[in-house]
Regions:
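Amphipathic alpha-helical coiled-coil segments and their boundaries
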Residues: 66-69, 76, 83, 123, ...
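Periplasmic alpha-helical coiled-coil/stalk elements that build and connect Gram-negative outer-membrane
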Residues: 3, 132, 139, 146-267, ...
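Outer membrane beta-barrel translocator domains of Type V secretion systems
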Residues: 106-108, 112-123, 129-147, 164
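Long, charged alpha-helical "stalk" segments
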Residues: 46-47, 83-85, 226, 278, ...
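Terminal intrinsically disordered/low-complexity segments used for targeting and assembly
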Residues: 1-72, 222-267, 435-459
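Short segments within alpha-helical structural elements
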Residues: 184, 213-240, 348, 353, ...
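A small-residue-enriched
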Residues: 19-40, 67, 71-126, 229-238, ...
Length: 459
């Protein structure tokens, strides 16, 4: 009967632990869903893992979008899967914090007689510290949840940035092909004129050099596209046949109405999960600080029962008590260490807040500068280049300029288009970095994990 009861108790503890683990990761997953529109999946050998694998394969069969690439990473990135285990470790710490230490049983048998001495001791002081330890461990669990959530959001932003970087490199590669074709045509025309004796050696060499440079630029652009594709492969965690995904080769246009950038610094301070994690770490440290010194002194306080049986058969039973005497170590080192750790966490919190504000300003300025370049290029530079092409075509038809001049003007137009695409790529990459710096959406309702009202500074 006792064995059955023990088994039931262990089973109940396991079920409660699994339920708490699901709830903890569910909090993180829901926050990620609200901030990214995508749900994270923790692969732990559950039936949901098989469904996630099927969904992953279906995503990779279709042309990838930024959102689809983020979803692939949340399902398949192994570094993220390793990060998810931090929640399991922190949850185990909560369970351990709620358990009493095992009692100690000692027995002594003296030969050749029948004298027997037995003692059962337990650290009774653990019962007093149990609630405080659990509160501190729960604060550390909340910190772990926030750290995991921050890593997920960081990875999602990195995937978006890598996606737009690769998409831009593909588009630049297509323009590089046009430049190379124009340079090849110009070099071929120069060769024919040179063979007919109508152009100088210097002119032919110049056109051939321009063609060679265009080929080098094209090779460099293609190498960048391969490199950015591998970067995206790594972030999504794909390999083998999974890397045969496709993607649209053109960047999307920037939104007509740019999002407001006022208040982004304050928004980042409110919703950055790594900052929330530091708040909970400091809260856990503050909760444990109050009893750490007393625990250091009283941790050897033991109470129990003592049994002695003498040789003639007489025996005696009575209580046993062991009390440490704090003559030398009365917890001063533990207290100083705990206070230093708390101050350290407070300074890290303040330092991270300063860094976050700086990151937001830098990413915001990069995004706005790139947007200004895109708008100026589309409204002024490209239309002007188009007019120059039209005028040059008319002059070429009237035999007022040479074919080389016409091809040169065409190359300059393509180069202007390349600069516009680079600015467009930089805009989307900077926007993804700004979302990472802000810790989520750039507008709308502030979204947070459930937080304690207590903060690092006790406000």
């Amino acid at each position: 009967m006792k064995t059955i009861l023990c088994f039931v108790a262990v089973l109940a503890t396991s079920v409660c632990s699994a339920a708490s683990l699901d709830q903890s990761f569910g909090d993180v997953s829901n926050t990620v869903l609200l901030r990214t529109g995508k749900r994270a999946q923790w692969n732990r050998g559950t039936p949901q893992d098989a469904a996630a694998e099927v969904y992953l394969r279906s995503l990779l069969k279709r042309p990838l979008t930024p959102n689809a690439a983020v979803q692939v990473a949340l399902l398949n990135n192994h570094e993220l899967q390793a990060t998810y285990e931090e929640i399991g470790i922190a949850q185990a710490d909560v369970i351990e914090a709620g358990l009493l230490r095992n009692p100690l049983f000692s027995i002594e048998r003296r030969f050749p007689g029948q004298a027997l001495e037995a003692e059962l001791l337990t650290q009774f002081i653990d019962i007093l510290f149990l609630p405080i330890r659990k509160r501190a461990a729960k604060a550390q669990l909340e910190a772990a949840k926030s750290r995991v959530g921050n890593e997920i959001l960081k990875t999602a932003a990195e995937v978006r940035a890598a996606f737009y970087e690769h998409q831009g490199n593909l588009q630049l590669g297509d323009l590089g092909v046009e430049v190379e074709k124009a340079a090849a045509a110009s070099a071929e025309a120069a060769l024919q004129l040179h063979q007919a004796g109508n152009t100088r050696d210097l002119d032919l060499a110049s056109e051939e050099a321009l063609h060679m440079q265009a080929k080098l630029d094209l090779s460099k652009g293609q190498a960048l596209a391969v490199e950015s594709r591998e970067k995206l492969n790594r972030l999504m965690g794909v390999w083998g046949d999974q890397t045969n995904w496709t993607i649209a080769a053109r960047l999307p246009d920037p939104p007509k109405n740019e999002i407001g950038t006022s208040g982004l610094e304050s928004r980042a301070i409110e919703q950055r999960l790594d900052l929330v994690a530091l708040r909970f770490e400091a809260l856990g440290q503050a909760r444990s600080l109050g009893f750490a010194r007393f625990q250091e002194v009283a941790q050897q306080f033991e109470i129990g029962g003592h049994y002695v049986r003498e040789i003639p058969g007489e025996h005696s039973t009575g209580p046993s008590l062991r009390i440490p005497i704090p003559l030398f170590n009365f917890g001063q080192g533990v207290k100083a260490r705990g206070e230093a750790k708390l101050r350290q966490l407070q300074q890290r919190y303040l330092g991270l807040a300063v860094q976050i504000r700086s990151d937001v300003r830098r990413a915001r300025d990069r995004m706005l500068n790139a947007r200004a370049m895109v708008d100026y290029s589309r409204s002024t530079v490209l239309p002007l280049r188009h007019r120059i092409i039209e005028e040059s075509q008319l002059q070429y038809n009237a035999m007022q300029i040479s074919l080389f001049d016409l091809l040169r003007v065409k190359q300059e137009e393509v180069n202007a288009a390349r600069q516009s695409v680079e600015a467009q790529r930089d805009y989307w990459v900077a926007r993804a970095e700004l979302e990472q710096a802000v810790g989520g959406p750039l507008n709308g309702k502030l979204l947070q994990l459930s937080e304690s009202k207590e903060t690092v500074h006790g406000r």
